[in-house]
């Protein structure tokens, strides 16, 4: 978990490299291995900055509770910037929580950088997507599929983007049903639906189904429609049930960690 300092700051081991020390450039596979070994070197959260996408710049974790949080000092951040462009923030979670915390997401959005997380011997790279709640609708940019894709990304499953122009649901393009099938989803019945499943709605009679919602706990849904609303979480009400065309589940649903969504929502709610 990231704890915001007075400026932006992150964590380093007891021995920290000096700013004038040369850092080797790594291939992607070697860099990933170095990051995982670095994470395994401590029972506390470790952190680093990635320089030019190729170099690891370890930072000291100066947070008073390093077992659960991390903080990078101004001095380490500034020293890293002297080495090159900071292109990502790296840290570890010693606890088995392989998604960004609410505090992590708050600071990731502020930095606008990819955040890389080591947990359970694996490395995940998170894009700096906007918070899930409160987005303004722009078709093809921040629309219902963008929200669906970004939410799944924060939960550990990456989906491709696809080109779409307004009114596709009136031209027989049927983008949702075609792309869901092509990207590892299969239909389930309403009685089988569980949190994390994707509800596809058909709001316009005679048109293709064109709206996606993610089912959450307590019969809530996360979605972003074109009715002038911001992206939001709300009850799965009767009107939505009547418009439901189908419900879909990803074949890697066991890897979908919904704590990624709840952490982001908690960050946005504070």
Where are the predicted features?
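...with weaker cross-activation on analogous glycine-rich loops/strands in unrelated enzymes
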Residues: 166-231, 236
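Glycine- and charge-enriched low-complexity intrinsically disordered segments
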Residues: 234-270
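Active-site nucleophilic cysteine motif
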Residues: 138-155
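Extended, compositionally biased flexible segments
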Residues: 81-94, 223-224, 230-231, 235-246
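Conserved beta-strand-loop surface patch within small alpha/beta domains used
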Residues: 1-88, 94-127
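Second-shell loop/turn segments in exported
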Residues: 132-138
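Short acidic alpha-helical/loop segments enriched in Asp/Glu that coordinate divalent cations
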Residues: 158-168
């Amino acid at each position: 978990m990231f704890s915001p300092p007075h400026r932006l700051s992150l964590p380093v081991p007891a021995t920290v490299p000096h700013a004038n020390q040369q850092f080797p450039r790594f291939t992607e596979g070697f860099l990933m291995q170095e990051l995982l070994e670095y994470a395994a070197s401590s029972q506390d959260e470790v952190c680093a900055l990635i320089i030019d996408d190729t170099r690891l710049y370890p930072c000291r974790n100066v947070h008073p509770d390093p077992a659960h949080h991390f903080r990078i000092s101004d001095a380490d951040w500034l020293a890293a910037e002297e080495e090159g462009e900071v292109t990502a923030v790296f840290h570890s979670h010693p606890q088995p929580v392989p998604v960004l915390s609410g505090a992590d997401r708050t600071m990731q959005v502020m930095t606008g950088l990819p955040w890389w997380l080591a947990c359970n011997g694996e490395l995940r790279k998170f894009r700096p997507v906007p918070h899930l709640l409160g987005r303004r609708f722009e078709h093809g940019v921040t629309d219902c599929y963008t929200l669906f894709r970004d939410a799944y990304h924060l939960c550990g499953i990456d989906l491709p983007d696809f080109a779409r122009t307004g009114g596709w649901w009136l031209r027989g393009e049927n983008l949702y049903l075609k792309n869901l099938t092509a990207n590892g989803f299969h239909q389930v019945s309403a009685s089988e639906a569980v949190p994390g499943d994707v509800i596809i709605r058909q709001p316009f009679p005679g048109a293709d189904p064109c709206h996606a919602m993610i089912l959450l706990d307590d019969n809530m849904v996360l979605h972003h429609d074109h009715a002038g609303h911001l992206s939001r979480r709300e009850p799965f009400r009767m009107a939505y049930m009547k418009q439901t065309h189908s419900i879909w589940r990803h074949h890697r649903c066991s890897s979908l960690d919904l704590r990624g969504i709840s952490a982001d929502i908690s960050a946005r709610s504070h």
